[in-house]
């Protein structure tokens, strides 16, 4: 129920921002009588596409805390929390970013994630399962991986890519709906018919599935960079050890908006093209093939 509420709130915010922005920019209707104004349509698609992506990014820390129940460590209550905060602080300084918020959330399975709108206003969260089942040097490497995601600007880059993808999904879906409605079925009434709306929804779903291959491909590439950064911040052998440990465990499930920035993910049921993370063995191989002077963060 909580996730449904968060989803509805996000969409209400997206629509509000989109409508206000379109009014400010003077973007009119993309339907001119029975014809399609491609310029206005593209502007409409871009505003909606980027608004959705960046509103989600802006709300990502709040959504993360709400969806997994992450508790930010404001004042460390024990030695473990003190170590977590100090480790992230040291890694953030080495990576040249502002100190992220550090949080812990209840989860039997091992995982961690990073989120936030900017490099200097981010969140790093770890599950209790990760702390329970991993050695300290392995946890340090996982934290380094997440700090590297922040330092590399992966959240903003992913939001930009998602905005571009959203734009083209909306744009081409409405063109397909227009062609089916006006050209194939020869509907000449003004405005959107039921056919247009149904075809538009179906086309957006289909194009969205195809477009997700692009975002997942990008996510897999960024994982190698985050592993590299984690090795730079916490040590190459520690990063390899953490990934090897994950090979023996079932990774925890994360909400969709954070899955791309977790340390690991469950395999996709529909093939590698839809995986947000490369197979762990490939990540380990890539690290082993990397020399010490190739380790870095952005």
UniProtKB/Swiss-Prot annotation:
EC number of this enzyme: 3.4.24.-
CC cofactor note: Binds 1 zinc ion per subunit.
Alphabetical UniProt keywords: Cell inner membrane, Cell membrane, Hydrolase, Membrane, Metal-binding, Metalloprotease, Protease, Stress response, Transmembrane, Transmembrane helix, Zinc
Active site: 146
Single GO term (MF): metalloendopeptidase activity
GO CC, alphabetical: plasma membrane
GO biological process entries: proteolysis
Pfam families linked to this entry: Peptidase_M48
Membrane topology, from the record: Multi-pass membrane protein
Chain residues that bind Zn(2+): 145, 149, 223
Transmembrane segments: 4-24, 38-58, 160-180, 194-214
UniProt cross-references to InterPro entries, sorted A to Z: HtpX_protease (IPR050083), Pept_M48_protease_HtpX (IPR022919), Peptidase_M48 (IPR001915)
Cellular compartments annotated: Cell inner membrane
Cofactor requirement: Zn(2+)
Family: Belongs to the peptidase M48B family.
Full protein name: Protease HtpX
Organism per entry: Hydrogenovibrio crunogenus (strain DSM 25203 / XCL-2) (Thiomicrospira crunogena)
Organism classification: Bacteria, Pseudomonadati, Pseudomonadota, Gammaproteobacteria, Thiotrichales
């Amino acid at each position: 129920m909580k996730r449904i509420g968060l989803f509805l709130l996000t969409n209400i915010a997206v629509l509000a921002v989109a409508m206000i922005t379109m009014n400010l920019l003077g973007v009119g209707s993309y339907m001119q009588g029975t014809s399609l104004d491609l310029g206005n349509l593209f502007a409409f698609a871009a505003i909606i596409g980027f608004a959705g992506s960046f509103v989600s990014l802006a709300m990502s820390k709040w959504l993360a805390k709400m969806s997994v129940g992450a508790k930010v460590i404001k004042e460390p209550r024990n030695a473990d929390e003190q170590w977590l905060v100090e480790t992230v602080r040291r890694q953030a300084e080495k990576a040249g970013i502002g100190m992220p918020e550090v949080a812990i959330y209840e989860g039997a399975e091992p995982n961690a994630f990073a989120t936030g709108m900017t490099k200097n206003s981010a969140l790093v969260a770890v599950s209790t399962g990760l702390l329970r089942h991993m050695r300290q040097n392995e946890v340090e490497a996982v934290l380094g991986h997440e700090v590297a995601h922040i330092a590399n600007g992966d959240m903003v880059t992913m939001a930009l890519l998602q905005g571009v993808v959203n734009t083209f999904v909306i744009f081409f879906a409405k063109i397909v709906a227009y062609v089916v409605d006006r050209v194939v079925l020869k509907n000449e009434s003004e405005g959107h018919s039921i056919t247009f709306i149904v075809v538009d929804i179906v086309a957006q779903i289909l194009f969205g599935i195809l477009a997700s291959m692009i975002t997942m491909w990008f996510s897999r590439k960024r994982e190698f960079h985050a592993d590299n950064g984690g090795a730079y911040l916490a040590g190459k052998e520690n990063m390899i050890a953490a990934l090897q440990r994950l090979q023996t465990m079932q990774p925890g499930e994360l909400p969709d908006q954070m899955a791309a920035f977790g340390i690991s993910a469950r395999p996709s049921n529909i093939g590698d093209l839809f995986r947000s993370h490369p197979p762990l063995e490939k990540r380990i191989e890539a690290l082993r093939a990397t020399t010490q002077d190739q380790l870095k963060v952005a």
